[in-house]
Amino acid sequence: MGEKKPEPLDFVKDFQEYLTQQTHHVNMISGSVSGDKEAEALQGAGTDGDQNGLDHPSVEVSLDENSGMLVDGFERTFDGKLKCRYCNYASKGTARLIEHIRIHTGEKPHRCHLCPFASAYERHLEAHMRSHTGEKPYKCELCSFRCSDRSNLSHHRRRKHKMVPIKGTRSSLSSKKMWGVLQKKTSNLGYSRRALINLSPPSMVVQKPDYLNDFTHEIPNIQTDSYESMAKTTPTGGLPRDPQELMVDNPLNQLSTLAGQLSSLPPENQNPASPDVVPCPDEKPFMIQQPSTQAVVSAVSASIPQSSSPTSPEPRPSHSQRNYSPVAGPSSEPSAHTSTPSIGNSQPSTPAPALPVQDPQLLHHCQHCDMYFADNILYTIHMGCHGYENPFQCNICGCKCKNKYDFACHFARGQHNQH
C-alpha cells in the first residue's frame, strides 16, 4: 500500500520517442511527408498528453486514418492491401510490392557475379545462374525434355504436346482430370492401349510435321526403358485393373495426350487422302488379345488411339498407303490372329531393336521394304518416308527411287536435296 505507482508520463514519453523514430523512418522511405512537420505534430501531441496525463489516442488516429500511412511507409487500400505510390498496383506482402516498385525506379539489385546480368527479381537471378551451372530442375512429365526455367517448360508443353484446350470442342476427359492423371507419379508402366481406346475415334488424323518432330529425338529412350520397365512391373496374368494406372509418366504417353486433345476434331479435317496428314497406325484387335507378350505390350502402348470396339474394326482404304498394312481391311477377331500385322522402322537405315525371338504375326510389316519391327512409333515414322502415290518416292525431298534397295540407300546417304 505504501509503494508509489509509476508515473504514466514516463510511458507516454517513451512511446512518443518511439513514434518519432518510426515517423522519420517513414519519411526516408516514402518521401511524401515532411519529416519536420511530422515531428512538430508529434511533439504537440506529446505536450497535450503531458498536461492531461492521459493516453495518446490522437497520435494513433493521425497515423492510421488521417495520413493513411503505416510504419512500413506504404498506403493501404480499403481491403487492407499495400498500394504502390506510382500506380494502382496493390499487394498483400511488402516484399512483393518492393519488387514491383523497382519496375518504376529501374533498380536492379540482384546482379550476377559471372556476367553483366542484373535483375530486379531474385528468382530471375536464380534462373539465370542455372545457365552457368547447367542445372535443369524442371522436367516434362510426357518426354525427356528438361529446362532451367518454369516458363520454358510451359512453352514446351504448349508447343510440343498441344496442351492448350481446343476452342469450341469438348474433350472426352476434362483438362483438370487429364492433368491430374498425367502428373501422377508412379513407377509402373501400364498397358495404356486400353486407355487410348476410350479417348478418340479411329478416324482421327495427326499432323505429320508435328508428329515426326515430336518423337524422333525420343526413339533411343523408348527402345530401352519401356521394355525393361514392362518386364518388371506388368503382371503376367493380364491388364492392370486401375484405369488411372494406364496413363503414367513415361515418354510413350505423349501420344495419349495428343489423342485426347484431338479426339473431337470436326469431320472436315478427317480426310485420310490429304497428303499433309498422316493417318492413324494400324489398329489390330489381336494386340489387345495378346497381353502375355510383355515386350510387344510395351511397344503397342505408344500407338495412336484405336476403335472402342476391338471385335469390329472399320474398313481401311485400299489405296497405297504409308501407315497401313495391305491386310488392314475388315476382319473378325479370330482372323486377326492369322493375318500379317504392320509395324515398321523410322528409316530404312535404322535397324530394328534387339528383341527376343517373337512370333512373326506379332510384328508389324512394311510391304514396300519387306521389313518387320515390333515398335509402332518407328513404323509410323518409317511409313511417313514413303511417298503417298509412289511408295519408292522420298516423301522428304521428292527423289524417285527405282526399288526398295535404291530407296534404302537414299536414306542411308541422308542427302535430301529439294527438287
From Swiss-Prot:
Gene: IKZF5
Zn finger spans (C2H2-type): 82-104, 110-132, 138-161, 364-386, 392-416
Signal peptide, first to last residue: none
GO terms, biological process: negative regulation of transcription by RNA polymerase II; regulation of transcription by RNA polymerase II
Bias (Polar residues): 223-236, 262-273, 332-349
Main localisation: nucleus
Region of interest: Disordered: 223-247, 262-356
UniProt name for this protein: Zinc finger protein Pegasus
